[in-house]
Amino acid sequence: MPIWLGILVGVVALVAGVALGFFIARKYMMNYLQKNPPINEQMLKMMMMQMGQKPSQKKINQMMSAMNKQQMK
């Protein structure tokens, strides 16, 4: 086997592995986000109402900013 053919096979295998890994990771993340959607203000408001609290916009904004800060850590 010539050396250039070995290098070519290695490069093609590397590119194919990267492409396959990208599509598998993309599919996994789309499934994950479909099963566990991120919490938005509407969902937070509904949760507060279910807990018996009256949701004010100020409280919702405080909780959203606290959740965003916690995610950044």
From Swiss-Prot:
Segments crossing the lipid bilayer: 3-23
Keyword terms of this UniProt record: Cell membrane, Membrane, Transmembrane, Transmembrane helix
Keyword set includes Membrane: yes
GO cellular component: plasma membrane
Pfam families: UPF0154
Location in or out of the cell: Cell membrane
Topology of the protein relative to the lipid bilayer: Single-pass membrane protein
NCBIfam families attached to this UniProt entry: PRK01844.1
Family named by the database record: Belongs to the UPF0154 family.
Protein's name according to its UniProt entry: UPF0154 protein BCB4264_A3788
